[in-house]
């Protein structure tokens, strides 16, 4: 049975090799979306997590609502709203801009919860000690709590980046010329989507594997300081 399978219809090695240089051109947009969204999401997520932990209901409840909405709505729907929906109200984004905004806002919700969990896991005695020294809330947060929470938050934050790298393929649905979009073009021209999708999967796997190596390096580095 296995011997009768025509493997060239599943993965055409020649086509994969020949099309690789073209497909890899999309890696720039894949990395741009992933890393810029991660950076923006981290900044936004930090403020949202602090608002989420605030004693002021005026800050806490909007943060809760934001997190609930972004975690409950598929990122593809958010991309469609930004790219296809906003023009109806006179606001137009390029495909890349819509992708950056969508992924940044979405990842911020997950990062906010990661930050909140990491900050909450720091012993309460640290807060009490800082208070006895006369440190303000922000001085305590900046100088004592956040540095300790980094190591706790690092593994799940790295997973968010890996998820962003993989999810960036959804940007192809709004015509961003990233990896998957390039692969789809070749697949349609050569009538061989299977080969191109497998090739794309291998490229994503390679990118995520490299990112995982750096994740391990960072975790070991911060383990010495916390």
Curated annotation (Swiss-Prot):
Q: Name one GO biological process term.
A: amino acid transport
Where does it localize?
Answer: Cell membrane
Keywords, sorted A to Z: Amino-acid transport, Cell membrane, Membrane, Transmembrane, Transmembrane helix, Transport
Query: Is Metal-binding found in the keyword set?
Result: no
Q: Is Ligase among this UniProt entry's keywords?
A: no
Q: How does it sit in the membrane?
A: Multi-pass membrane protein
Occurrences of domain ABC transmembrane type-1 (ranges): 27-215
For this protein, the record's InterPro entries field holds: AA_ABC_transptr_permease_3TM, ArtM/GltK/GlnP/TcyL/YhdX-like, MetI-like, MetI-like_sf
GO cellular component terms, alphabetically, are: ATP-binding cassette (ABC) transporter complex; plasma membrane
Spans through the membrane: 31-51, 73-93, 94-114, 160-180, 194-214
List the Gene Ontology MF annotations in alphabetical order: transmembrane transporter activity
Stated role: Part of a binding-protein-dependent transport system. Probably responsible for the translocation of the substrate across the membrane.
Q: Which PANTHER family does UniProt cross-reference here?
A: L-CYSTINE TRANSPORT SYSTEM PERMEASE PROTEIN TCYL, MEMBRANE COMPONENT OF AMINO ACID ABC TRANSPORTER
Which family is it part of? Belongs to the binding-protein-dependent transport system permease family. HisMQ subfamily.
What is the protein named?
Probable amino-acid ABC transporter permease protein YckA
What gene is behind this protein?
yckA
């Amino acid at each position: 049975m296995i011997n009768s399978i025509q493997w060239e219809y599943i993965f055409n090695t020649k086509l994969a090799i020949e099309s690789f240089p073209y497909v890899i051109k999309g890696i720039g947009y894949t990395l741009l979306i992933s890393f810029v969204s991660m950076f923006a999401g981290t900044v936004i997520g930090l403020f949202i997590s602090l608002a989420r932990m605030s004693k002021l209901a005026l800050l806490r409840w909007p943060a809760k609502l934001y997190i609930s909405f972004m975690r409950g709505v598929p990122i593809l729907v958010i991309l469609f709203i930004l790219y296809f929906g906003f023009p109806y109200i006179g606001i137009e984004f390029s495909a890349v801009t819509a992708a950056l905004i969508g992924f940044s806002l979405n990842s911020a919700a997950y990062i906010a919860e990661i930050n909140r969990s990491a900050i909450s896991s720091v012993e309460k005695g640290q807060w009490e000690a800082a208070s006895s020294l006369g440190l303000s809330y922000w001085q305590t947060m900046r100088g004592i709590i956040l540095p300790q929470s980094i190591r706790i938050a690092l593994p799940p934050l790295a997973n968010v980046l890996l998820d962003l790298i993989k999810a960036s393929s959804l940007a192809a649905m709004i015509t961003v010329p990233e990896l998957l979009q390039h692969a789809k073009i070749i697949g349609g021209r050569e009538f061989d989507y299977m080969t191109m999708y497998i090739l794309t999967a291998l490229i994503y796997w390679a990118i995520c594997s490299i990112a995982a190596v750096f994740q391990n390096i960072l975790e070991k580095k911060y383990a010495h300081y916390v």
